[in-house]
């Protein structure tokens, strides 16, 4: 497949400065227009924090109007990243390759909530995702009125059919 975008998601202020001209991730926690201004000095597109409510987004965009801001509108928020293989440690496996089996693993809490675990066999990193999926696709027109122009979808364990439906919903909301 051709590469449509070779930009890197900057997940920290250090990587943002080092990899200038890329896209900031929501991990930078852009929650006010001062942070947005700083992030725009180093990034071509800045993703606003998912923790902002509508009034906070409105305030940010009123104080720093720009056409190159983004917002996560669908996906499970990454809650934790560990530089260790959670599966290997859990199953006490030596020379473990459990994560290569493509099974879905979940962490279940005392309330029976299921947190998806993603693994990266290349660097033995584990990611724990929120048990609830954020779905703000219906609010895209409202966010567009504020001046937000980029809408991100993070897919993790969705089926092919779910993926097509999510993308179709998004396309309808942004009038593609």
Where are these regions (language model features)?
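Active-site pocket-lining/capping segments in soluble small-molecule metabolic enzymes
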Residues: 1-176
């Amino acid at each position: 497949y051709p590469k449509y975008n070779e930009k890197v998601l900057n997940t920290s202020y250090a990587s943002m400065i080092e990899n200038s001209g890329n896209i900031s991730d929501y991990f930078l926690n852009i929650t006010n227009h001062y942070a947005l201004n700083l992030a725009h000095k180093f990034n071509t597109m800045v993703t606003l924090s998912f923790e902002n409510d509508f009034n906070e987004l409105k305030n940010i965009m009123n104080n720093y109007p720009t056409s190159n801001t983004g917002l996560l509108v669908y996906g499970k928020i990454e809650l934790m990243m560990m530089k260790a293989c959670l599966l290997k440690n859990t199953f006490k496996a030596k020379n473990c390759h459990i994560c290569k089996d493509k099974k879905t693993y979940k962490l279940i809490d005392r309330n029976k909530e299921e947190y998806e675990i993603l693994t990266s066999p290349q660097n033995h990193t584990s990611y724990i995702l929120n048990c609830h999926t954020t779905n703000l696709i219906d609010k895209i027109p409202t966010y567009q009125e504020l001046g937000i122009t980029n809408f991100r979808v993070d897919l993790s364990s969705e089926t092919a059919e779910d993926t097509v439906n999510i993308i179709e919903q998004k396309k309808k909301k942004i009038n593609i």
